[in-house]
Amino acid sequence: MPAEVHGSPPASLCPCPSVKFRPGLPAMALLTALDDTLPEEAQGPGRRMILLSTPSQSDALRACFERNLYPGIATKEQLAQGIDIPEPRVQIWFQNERSCQLRQHRRQSRPWPGRRDPQKGRRKRTAITGSQTALLLRAFEKDRFPGIPAREELARETGLPESRIQLWFQNRRARHWGQSGRAPTQASIRCNAAPIG
């Protein structure tokens, strides 16, 4: 069992300075499934030990979680060292806590603070008319990779921004590639060609 932590760890080890450690509490307790209290499939030498954190460790984890739902590896390592829990277990704790929070927010129909609002900051979809599509398709048949001057000319003809023309060609190439199957490469053409002479 790890050593007991008495008092507060040095401030340099704990990224959450507001967390206070209670003196005399063991840093962590590990339980193993050696008796018949767990189902058979949960027992055995390959199973991970269950981590039971002390109240002070839980306080430290919660304080850091409230400050940042997605802490970086350095923060998790400092926290793990400060409360004497292995870093992978700290990472799993954060994943589990985010999952619980997300479930609670879904039940209460509140927006999840860890994700941006899908409608906020999203570009409005550009509507392309049939005549604009026909013009772009003709240009695509002539040249699937038009340069800037050609795209600017298409922008003038269609009234669409050049950046939208560029994206339309990228999307069309991706769709065309998927529908037509893989085009043969130059190397495969050379390898499959009949020998000369």
From Swiss-Prot:
Keyword flag Nucleus: yes
DNA-binding region(s) in UniProt: 46-105, 121-180
GO molecular function: DNA-binding transcription factor activity, RNA polymerase II-specific; RNA polymerase II transcription regulatory region sequence-specific DNA binding
Keyword Repeat: yes
Tissue expression notes: Expressed in hepatoma Hep3B cells.
Subcellular location: Nucleus
Keywords: DNA-binding, Homeobox, Nucleus, Repeat
Disulfide bond entries: none
Segments of this protein annotated with the region Disordered: 102-127
GO-annotated biological processes: regulation of transcription by RNA polymerase II
SUPFAM superfamilies per UniProt: Homeodomain-like (SSF46689)
Pfam families linked: Homeodomain (PF00046)
Gene Ontology terms: cellular component: nucleus
Family named by the database record: Belongs to the paired homeobox family.
Extra remark beyond the main annotation: DUX genes are present in 3.3-kilobase elements, a tandem repeat family scattered in the genome found on the short arms of all acrocentric chromosomes as well as on several other chromosomes. May be functional despite lack of introns and of a poly(A) addition signal.
Protein's name in the database: Putative double homeobox protein 3
Organism expressing this protein natively: Homo sapiens (Human)
Lineage start: Eukaryota, Metazoa, Chordata, Craniata, Vertebrata
Gene: DUX3
